[in-house]
Amino acid sequence: MVKIWNAENKIILERKLWLAVLQAQKDLGQQVPDGVIEDYIKVLDQVDLDSIHDRERIVKHDVKARIEEFCSLAGHEHIHKGMTSRDLTENVEQLQIRQALELICCQAAAALRLLSENATTYSETAVTGRTHNVAAQVTTLGKRFASAAEEMLHAFTNIEQIVANYPLRGIKGPVGTQQDLVDLLGGSEQVELLEEKVRDHLGFTHTLDSVGQVYPRSLDFNVVSGLVQLSSAPANLAKTLRLMAGHDLVTEGFQEGQVGSSAMPHKMNMRSCERISGLSHVLQGYLTMVTSLVGDQWNEGDVSCSVVRRVALPDAFLAIDGLLQTFLSVLEDFGAYPKVIERELNHYLPFLSTTRILTAATQAGMGREEAHEAIKAHAVSAALDLRNNNEGENTLLQRIADDPEIPLSFDELKSAIATSDIGRTDRQIKAVNQVIQQVIERHPESKSYNPQTII
């Protein structure tokens, strides 16, 4: 990702675009002396940022400085004919965006694969489900991974659609009429052929037909909002894992030699999950920046958006890249502590099954609201008893069994809270995994993708 967005790479991409346009112009009848294109090609990779900056200090124009630098190196002045600065920068930035999106697709597909693997591994690991962070019902650890995966699948599909439908601005000139190209090439048909050659060179499937100097900034909003959507599932799961780690239920991995705190030797913090949460907030900040550009275009275009885009676009991609790299590491190094999970589950289990007890009571002929009130009274009493007596046992089932108004025996209650079969979690996980398998088949490169080492 850093390579896609670094300054040297962008300059080389710009030079390649200049030469693609020049070659197309030559093919369409423009006089370009023999050897000129070859001379440009020879110096294509000679990027001296200091020299370009020195030129920019004088001309106060970044593209003009890069034109002068490339022409000086090649010894010719044949590039940029019939073009304006945005013909260069807009198309190259769109190429960078598409390349970055394609890399993100690979990383996200790899994350979906690992989510699927963890969902399968922990599909039968019953855990205390929580709403409002309070013990609620029994769920499985595998379902938590599957739920994150399904949210990420929707975001991933959106990114795929953005890539498939992303349009190139094309070579349109200062206000979008392509007048200079018509004059240069001698007709509209020739300009259309040039557009096709440029589109093919950049690897796009279609080009915008009627734009001004800049392409609509709502396209940038669509891209960055897609990245924010993609970050949501990792951030949600990371927060859940952080909460679970606070009860010693799971770990994101703790390597040999790692230190959790400079003050407290025992600490094993969920620093990577915390990083995921932080990077998701950073991404939302960049979305706010590009949102401010939507509906703010002056006439055919101006450069007030340039400052925002030069920061927000590359940095948004670097943020999602860091988030996904970290997420992949968490998924690879993740571990659970079954005995602690079981201990917590046993502590809460009767409470986690009050809805099942309620269903059993209504099936035995009791009115739902009457049963709800009776079970609630016993549950609150048993919970307070537990909190005030650390050594006490959970007496909820016995309290309900002893209540003559509730037509359920102790054995019937025990049967109602069994955790061997937890709803439809197994089918839900399998359904999500099937969709993920389709993603992996579309992106086979994700099978071998390895995240960078996270420091």
Segments from the language model and where they lie:
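Short acidic (Asp/Glu) and glycine-rich catalytic loops that position anionic groups and cofactors
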Residues: 1, 19, 44-50, 254-259, ...
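A helix-coil-helix interface module used to build multimeric assemblies
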Residues: 1-178, 183, 189-197, 260-261, ...
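Short beta-alpha connecting loops at secondary-structure transitions
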Residues: 2-7, 51-53, 259-278, 301-315, ...
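A structural signal for small-residue-enriched, beta-sheet-centric alpha/beta enzyme cores
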Residues: 85, 182, 186, 207-211, ...
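Charged, flexible cofactor/metal-binding loops and thiol motifs
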Residues: 93-106, 120, 134-297, 304-322
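Long, amphipathic alpha-helical stalk/connector segments used for oligomerization, subunit docking
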Residues: 282-368, 374-377
